[in-house]
């Protein structure tokens, strides 16, 4: 990570703290992650702005505040095994991989999945398992998960993901069609309780795979 990038990432973490992010481990991970690595060169100059940016295939890299907020919500109970649905650029996975012992991540667009895998390898993050597939279905043979994060908006809460939560596990995801609500769902036995966190805007969670 270059000196300029490090300074920019540290300044971004400070801005996120001012915006309400309080988990110091999350802020540290943000400050150590070169966000420009996850963008095309033409957009690298915008890497440390607190905004979502396009990454191709109709997808985006999420606003850093949302990345930090969802991570903060996910870490509430110190999960050991985490599933991310929607690898995208790999930036969110890079943050999570610094904070949890084991991360599994699914992406339905093959090209994005390949790029993300290469980026995390370059960052020497080796506690991540990648899957090319339909995120609506989760990753059953790696379940149960202590926490699941969905980085695209589901029209309804996917039943498969609920079933793959461990006892006491949490599911953090945006739900809705146009503007969505960020929700945290907690499993207690066979029951699920939900909290609505804030209004957000994500690309839709789409069924199936795309080469």
UniProtKB/Swiss-Prot annotation:
Cysteine disulfide links: none
A Pfam family of this chain: PCMT
Compartments it resides in: Cytoplasm
InterPro entries documented for this protein: PCMT, SAM-dependent_MTases_sf
A GO CC annotation given for this chain: cytoplasm
EC annotation from Swiss-Prot or TrEMBL: 2.1.1.77
GO biological process: methylation; protein modification process; protein repair
Active-site annotation: 62
Single Gene Ontology MF annotation: protein-L-isoaspartate (D-aspartate) O-methyltransferase activity
Keyword check for Transferase: yes
Catalytic activity, as annotated: [protein]-L-isoaspartate + S-adenosyl-L-methionine = [protein]-L-isoaspartate alpha-methyl ester + S-adenosyl-L-homocysteine
Broad EC category: transferase
Domain of life of the source: Bacteria
The keyword Transferase is annotated on this UniProt entry: yes
Transmembrane segments: none
Keyword list, A-Z: Cytoplasm, Methyltransferase, S-adenosyl-L-methionine, Transferase
Family in the record: Belongs to the methyltransferase superfamily. L-isoaspartyl/D-aspartyl protein methyltransferase family.
Function: Catalyzes the methyl esterification of L-isoaspartyl residues in peptides and proteins that result from spontaneous decomposition of normal L-aspartyl and L-asparaginyl residues. It plays a role in the repair and/or degradation of damaged proteins.
NCBIfam families reported in the protein's UniProt record: pimt (TIGR00080), PRK00312.1 (NF001453)
UniProt name for this protein: Protein-L-isoaspartate O-methyltransferase
Source organism phylogeny: Bacteria, Pseudomonadati, Pseudomonadota, Gammaproteobacteria, Alteromonadales
